[in-house]
Amino acid sequence: KFVFNVGGDKTESSSWLLDKWKSPKTIRKWGYYKDLYLGEGFKVKELVIEPFSCLSMQRHEHRSELWNLVSGSAEIHMGIGEEKMIYELNNNASVLIEKGEWHMGCNMTDKPAHIVEIWRGNTEELTEKDIERIQVD
């Protein structure tokens, strides 16, 4: 026998499935990201940096990025060589990364770091291809 209205309405009972369908995870060695929204001149992403992991040192020609830490802790390494600065982010902190600025996000704790990242730039150029990486020690 099939029973209706058990466990909430249909949208509530399958919301986890809809969330995974609308914004699947892209797995990386440092954790994962999800594309959440693309608007005119901006893109919103969720980044999760796993414990004791770092993204690559990178910069972008066509976009700036605003990183908003929503849980956990993270270090943002900005610049290279003698101009390198390390910013520690805790809950609700944010950092603006300008176009062309070298940066690398790291999580040196035992809990995941959750970041909401906002890209700003020309909509057509807001892609994962807009990246230059270098190896750092």
PLM-predicted stretches and their roles:
Residues 1-29:
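Classical nucleotidyltransferase
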Residues 18-57, 86-91, 128-137:
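A short, N-terminal "cap"/entry segment at the start of jelly-roll beta-barrel domains
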Residues 46, 65, 117:
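Acidic-residue sensor for enzyme active/binding pockets
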Residues 53, 62-63, 101-102, 111, ...:
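A generic "binding-loop/recognition-motif" signal
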Residues 56-57, 76-77, 97, 103-110, ...:
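Short beta-strand His + acidic residue motifs that chelate non-heme Fe in jelly-roll/DSBH
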Residues 62-81:
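Glycine- and acidic-residue-biased ligand/ion/polar-headgroup-sensing regions
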Residues 80-102:
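Short acidic-glycine-tyrosine-enriched beta hairpin
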Residues 104-137:
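Double-stranded beta-helix
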